[in-house]
């Protein structure tokens, strides 16, 4: 599957304008951020889910390191390369036993359901989440990452994302880490 480069989502400029007008902290961040760098699609749907699985409950640096080793071991991260790699080979990249099972399960599912990702494109956010969460090892956070980074859906706020929570705490100087309770 080829990766189609795309421009900003149609809602992007309007969303930035609203956020800039309502929050001076976000205005400052928006004004100094190159949003095109973050909006470029660089992964296939399979890679987006695989990357989210790899990144579950570990730091971005750790996930990047494992992903680099996985690419070195497998080549392109896709269902075929995951399926042909042994669990031992995958574990050597730093993946846990569970994440190896999750990736193998994802690869098997996509191998048996070739139009799975295409079908997700036309579903509502809730339907996408429900469908993805049926996959072994995929929960709400992974589904939210897919909605954000693959489908570029608006109005997704992953309040279970520790990186997001830590960033909000840092930029707003919040000492209480129970942000989810406030929203």
Residue ranges with predicted function:
Residues 161-183:
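C-terminal end-helix/capping segment
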Residues 41-57:
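Alpha-helical scaffold segments that form or flank carboxylate-/histidine-based iron centers
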Residues 33, 110-114, 171, 175:
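A short secondary-structure junction motif
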Residues 49-54, 103-107, 146:
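Short alpha-helical scaffolding segments that buttress acidic/His motifs in well-ordered protein cores
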Residues 59, 63-136:
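Alpha-helical ds-nucleic-acid-binding substructure associated with the helix-hairpin-helix region
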Residues 124-169:
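Catalytic DNA-binding helix-loop module of base-excision-repair DNA glycosylases/AP lyases
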Residues 1-41, 174:
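Intrinsically disordered, low-complexity, charged terminal extensions of DNA damage-control enzymes
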Residues 5-8, 43-46, 80-82, 121-124, ...:
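Short acidic alpha-helix initiation/capping motifs at coil-to-helix transition points
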């Amino acid at each position: 599957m080829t990766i189609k480069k795309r421009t900003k989502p149609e809602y992007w400029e309007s969303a930035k304008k609203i956020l800039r007008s309502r929050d001076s902290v976000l205005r400052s961040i928006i004004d100094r951020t190159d949003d095109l760098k973050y909006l470029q699609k660089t992964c296939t749907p399979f890679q987006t889910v695989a990357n989210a699985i790899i990144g579950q409950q570990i730091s971005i640096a750790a996930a990047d390191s494992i992903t680099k080793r996985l690419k070195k071991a497998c080549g392109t991260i896709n269902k075929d390369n995951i399926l042909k790699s042994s669990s031992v080979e995958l574990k050597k990249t730093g993946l846990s036993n569970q994440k190896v099972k999750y990736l193998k399960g994802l690869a098997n599912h996509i191998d048996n359901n070739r139009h799975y990702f295409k079908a997700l494109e036309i579903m509502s956010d809730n339907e996408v989440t429900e469908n993805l969460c049926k996959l072994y090892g995929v929960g709400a956070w992974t589904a939210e990452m897919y909605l954000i980074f693959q489908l570029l859906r608006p109005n997704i706020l992953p309040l279970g994302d520790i990186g997001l929570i830590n960033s909000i705490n840092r930029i707003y100087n919040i000492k209480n880490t129970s942000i989810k309770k406030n929203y």
